[in-house]
Amino acid sequence: MRWKLMAHVLRRPTWWLGLLSMLGAFGFQVAALDQGGLTLVQPLLVTELIFLALVLRFWFGRPLGWREAFGVVLTVAGLATFLAISNQGGGSLVPDQLGWLLMVIATVGAAALCVSLARVGSRPWRSAWYGAAAAIAFAVSAAFMKASTVLVHRGGLPVLFTHFEPYGIAVAGLAGLFLAQNAFLAGPITASQASLVIVDPLASIIIGVGLFGDNLRGGIGALALDAATLALMSLGLVVLCHSPLIVNTSPEDRLVRASHRVAREAQAS
């Protein structure tokens, strides 16, 4: 992982502009988590690519080919079917200290495994695994967001200063940002972005069910159907992430371009 390059990146205004475009929806995400569980809210974040495709088509007049249309259809079909049949509910459990500890151990271990896998192999392989590690960190940050909204309802804003959950948002979010930056620099954005948009909702669903008591339909058949719809959604996201039109106009791509420019400047100096 490139700590020295991060220092160069942080001094460039273009990088901060790209970062702000990625974080602009933070407040809306908190508001959504205040109203719904992780298994409902986090999968909706994949609609970023769908709306990007629609904006490119109807606002900027960019022609969308079969790849973009096919990816949008698959993603919408998988996401809509999952939300319709998975019977989300619950999510009212307040995690205890043991629950948080087990979640942190599991997610840190999973992220560490992803990082270790990212240290070797081809550039797409490394980029994908760094992206998966970043997605896990962002899912953990969302879990801390959800818990923080519960704390505010119970004790008001001052209670945030006396609990660890708000600080967990910052720690997990910064870790995710650092890992995502390494993912963008390690290889093609098609690999890193696919990992980010697929692993984040999947990790969030697992955390929501295991930590907050979110409900999915019971039974092997129902769970298999849930898995099939998520697989369909993931396939659509992979198709969209390999679209030159989508990738070259995404906020992540702007971050990559700024970072690569900084890397060249750092090497030249």
List where the protein language model places each region.
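Polytopic alpha-helical membrane proteins, predominantly small-molecule transporters/carriers
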Residues: 1-269
